[in-house]
């Protein structure tokens, strides 16, 4: 598959890092982390671990997002065409979203 036909892996990685950082801050604020004695002794609490993704995981994530978005647009286009419209609107995406999420 051509690299131009997929999402930029640097962008996806930046989005993942942003989400991981936000979840880390939320966990710290809520103090919901209960470290066991073994974790404290080993220094492996969730607070100490940094989330990361390797290159293959990022490529796979990009391909999955590409497939998801492509399928969403195709399904929404079918609904729009059935209604006699030339453009896809948010309501078309809203109608296909439940089944799309179940399919993925």
From Swiss-Prot:
Molecular function via GO: DNA binding
Protein location: Nucleus
Principal location class: nucleus
Alphabetical list of InterPro entries matching this protein: CENP-X
This protein's GO CC annotations: nucleus
Family: Belongs to the CENP-X/MHF2 family.
The entry's keywords: DNA damage, DNA recombination, DNA repair, DNA-binding, Nucleus
Protein name in the entry: Protein MHF2 homolog
Record's function text: Acts in the same pathway as FANCM to restrain class II meiotic crossing over (CO), and acts with FANCM during meiosis to repair interstrand cross-links (ICLs).
Any one GO BP annotation for this protein: homologous chromosome pairing at meiosis
């Amino acid at each position: 598959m051509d690299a131009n036909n997929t999402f930029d892996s640097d962008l996806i990685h930046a989005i993942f890092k942003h989400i991981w950082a936000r979840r880390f801050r939320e966990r710290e604020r809520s103090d919901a982390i209960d470290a066991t004695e073994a974790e404290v002794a080993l220094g492996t609490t969730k607070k100490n671990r940094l989330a990361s993704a390797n290159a293959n995981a990022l490529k796979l994530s990009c391909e999955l997002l590409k497939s998801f978005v492509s399928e969403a647009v195709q399904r929404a286009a079918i609904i729009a065409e059935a209604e006699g419209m030339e453009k896809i609107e948010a309501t078309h995406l809203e109608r296909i979203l439940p089944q799309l999420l179940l399919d993925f």
